[in-house]
Amino acid sequence: GIPCAESCVYIPCTITALLGCSCKNKVCYN
């Protein structure tokens, strides 16, 4: 996938989640 410039180590994907990104390996991917 494409990195969404948001991490999800402590909190889940927030802004990028609205763009269809999901958490994988502590990073939000599209």
Curated annotation (Swiss-Prot):
Instruction: Explain the post-translational modification.
Output: This is a cyclic peptide.
| InterPro entries xrefs | Cyclotide, Cyclotide_bracelet_CS, Cyclotide_sf
Q: Domain of life here?
A: Eukaryota
A single GO BP: defense response
Question: What function does this protein fulfil?
Answer: Probably participates in a plant defense mechanism.
What does the entry note on its domains?
The presence of a 'disulfide through disulfide knot' structurally defines this protein as a knottin.
Q: What is this protein called?
A: Cyclotide hypa-A
Give the originating organism.
Answer: Pombalia parviflora
